[in-house]
Amino acid sequence: MKNVRILDCTLRDGGRIIDCAFPDEETKEISRRLAEAKIDIIEVGFLRDRRKVNYQGNSTFFTDVDQIRPFVNKEKKGVLYTAFIDYGMCDIDTLKPYDGTSIDAIRFGFTKKNYDEEKEEVIRWINVIKEKGYKLFIQGVNSLNYTDRELLEIVDMVNEAHPYSFGIVDTYGAMYMDDVDRLYGLIDHNMSSDICINFHSHNNYQLSFAFAQEVIKLSGTSNRQIIIDGTLGGMGKVAGNLNTELIVDFLVRKKQYDYELDEIFDLLDDYIVKYTLDHKWGYSTSAMMAGIYKSHPNNVIYLTEKFRLDSKDIGKILSMIDPATRQRYDYDNIEKLYIEYVSEKVDDHEAINKLKEIIGNREVVV
């Protein structure tokens, strides 16, 4: 019995690089053909608050589970369909009950700040999702942000809520292998054995594929069911994600799983390659800087696109931002820090003193 499943989140996390503006027909085909490739779990997009998002199609920012119905194939057995809800960005009380015609599961993400400041409300959202009948995936954003003690407190909450899965999330692409080993060990040894571990990484250090193999190896020692996230071509903001095609190939050739790799290649050629013409993702030194400073990718994108800065300068400005603020994005603050940094970097005192020596007391006509 296989204990590893793949969750493809191209239409959700991959789509962030194009503001999730997938044409409806493309969303339908990507979803359908991922199912044909025997991908276990397909994430079709976000669920957002209809008071803030006006859904008119051609987007995977949905506001109602009924809008997702055309993009799931209920005739394909063995496939789970999910949507992602960020805490505070959806009206959870208007979520329609599960009826078997749309998504099967909801991945629910919250930050440490959310949990520290609004713990009771975060737990209420968790309970609402379960009460509505959906399989629940709990994603504590940025796992590295928790101390071991804090993470164990979250695991206690997870054991009580008893979701389908709980995630190790490398939100800012900042993990190294020892971080993965430590987090996996803590969770695996303290979480109920029938709750899956869901691993989601970003490729800032070009380690996503290595991490996936490590988590698979670790799961073999405990018979834990695990879920590995990926996107087609690694599509995603800045460094992007684990490539779905890489983990598919690994599991087919090394573990004798039965995914259809050729179907994945066709999806890449038919739908993903075209996005690389206007949108860049993958490893870069700028992406590395985002990992080093655990920074929201939008900060790096803004500094790169607006100011055309060198990687070293990007790192210097990121280091000037408060660590907690760095995990969000505030363009006004970045503008202010950029001006401050450039002012300090451009030190013209030496040039002025040299001119004074040359000119002396002579008059200058400009």
Label for each model-derived stretch:
Residues 1-366:
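Catalytic cores and adjacent flexible loops of soluble metabolic enzymes
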